[in-house]
Amino acid sequence: MSAVRIKKGDTVKVIAGKDKGKEGKVLSVNAKNHTALVEGVNMVTKHAKPSAANQQGGILHQEAPIDISNIAYSLKGKETKIGYDFKDGKKVRVAKATGEVID
């Protein structure tokens, strides 16, 4: 498997699957399973019983993890690959399409 170059807080675009074309913010990344949780993407329905934490219970809609290979970093509405470069002795992420430093 390749390295995970997507980080929490990045804006990504879905490039494959049922939500293809949607954009969202990365809520969390699981490098071990090669998945990411993206806001508003890959929504699933959960049926919750009433409990101390959830008095009413009922049907909940929440995000499910999506494979990293199905998302791409979105820079100004266009998807791009991410590479690494060294600037002033520090390793930084760079958009391969434009050469722009991401962080």
Curated annotation (Swiss-Prot):
GO CC list: ribonucleoprotein complex; ribosome
Subunit architecture: Part of the 50S ribosomal subunit.
Record SUPFAM superfamilies: Translation proteins SH3-like domain
Keyword RNA-binding (UniProt): yes
Matches recorded under PROSITE patterns: RIBOSOMAL_L24
Gene3D superfamilies: 2.30.30.30
InterPro entries registered for this protein in UniProt: KOW, Rib_uL2_dom2, Ribosomal_uL24, Ribosomal_uL24_CS, Ribosomal_uL24_KOW, Translation_prot_SH3-like_sf
Key words of the record: Ribonucleoprotein, Ribosomal protein, RNA-binding, rRNA-binding
GO molecular function, one term: structural constituent of ribosome
Protein name as it appears in the record: Large ribosomal subunit protein uL24
Family: Belongs to the universal ribosomal protein uL24 family.
